[in-house]
Amino acid sequence: MSSPQTSNRMTLRPIELKTANAFVTTLHRHHKPVQGHRFSLGAYVGSSLVGTVSVGRPVARFGGDPLVVLEVTRLCTDGTADACSFLYGAAARVGKAMGYQRIQTYILATETGTSLKASGWTDEGLAGGGQWKHTDGKPRRTDQPTERKRRWAKMLS
């Protein structure tokens, strides 16, 4: 992109993972920062960061070929109107420009997905949830929601 893209009063900028993770640490309701990413984007109003999206390889074991499929692993906003839709749409456009064929994400089953629907994503239904165990039988982290998830996706090609 040669110049920042705007939607209403928001501006899109690439950001470093540490910036996205700091935002998530401060504002995300139920998740911690991510370990890695392919790219992260920030939504700004003026000079204020109002939302971030981190996009990486598919996390689930059978989530898709990481050279073809991207996954939104974190999206976090400060509540600014339309920031979620702005970031989901931007993530899909950037993924398409990079040559990916599909982008997906998982949200809690109790979340509505309104921003995803507004951005042209498709609800693919319930997927996953619960809690896995380590191969040695020890329980995994319990600081994340264990309820069912809904997978949403958008074809990019």
Model regions: which residues?
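N-terminal carbohydrate-binding/catalytic regions of secreted carbohydrate-active enzymes
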Residues: P33-L41
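Active-site and channel-lining beta-strand-loop segments
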Residues: V24, L41-Y44
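C-terminal end-of-chain micro-motif
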Residues: M1, L156-S157
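Short amphipathic alpha-helix that is part of the acyltransferase structural core
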Residues: M1-V34
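C-terminal edge-of-domain segments
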Residues: R150-M155
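Acyl-donor binding region in acyl/amide transferases
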Residues: T11-P14, R38, V45-G46, T52-R148
